[in-house]
Amino acid sequence: MHKLTIVVLLLICWGCGPQLQVYSDYDPSYDLKNYTTFNWGPKINIEAGNNPLYYNELNDKRIKGAALQQLTARGYRFEEGSSDLVVHYHIIIDDQTIIVTDPPGYEYGPYWLRMQTNIRQYQEGTLIIDIMDSHTNNLIWRGWATSAIDMHYSPDHTEVLIKKAVDKIFKKFPKGVKTSASTGFNQAAY
């Protein structure tokens, strides 16, 4: 019985952990039917605030590969040089703190435990994908995903996480039709 209680508590805590949150925003005055090609924007210079563990060529290939797959599936064609759209991405890593308080007094076996407050620190990563009009340099669409991250992921796990984030971001991408101003900012938790 004691082992079953621990397993149930672990499953509850795992289910309450940070999830991948996906958002998008766009300019409804642009008609995506007028665009057929895209290209990558210039590489971002690594600054002191950008963690080189996340800004690297391996993740660059993973993000671009997943975005390429999503955009070509929507009928856009990759074109080196002159194109209708320019795709940029950004990675932001922030330190976060969460405070978890146990309920006031609970019984654990033969012991009565007092309320405890635990402070947990973790890193939160945000992947932002921007799509801009290449002729005006105006932002047309922005999608982003935010989640807790772990620096100790295996390469296979990292690839799966990036693909999942990019796929969920592009689920918010308009389907090549004129968007309506009434829908504006969108959010979905996965």
Model region roles, listed by residue range:
Residues 67-75, 91, 95, 135, ...:
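Sec/Tat-exported extracytoplasmic proteins
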Residues 2-8:
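Sec-dependent signal peptide recognition
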Residues 17-29, 119-127, 133-140, 146-190:
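C-terminal/domain-edge helix-coil "capping" segments
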Residues 25-44:
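Post-signal peptide N-terminal segment of mature Sec-exported envelope proteins
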Residues 42-94:
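N-terminal segment of the mature soluble domain
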Residues 34-36, 74, 83-85, 123-128, ...:
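Envelope-exposed proteins and targeting segments
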Residues 85, 89-138:
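Surface-exposed short loop/turn segments
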Residues 12-15:
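C-terminal motif of bacterial Sec signal peptides marking the signal peptidase cleavage site
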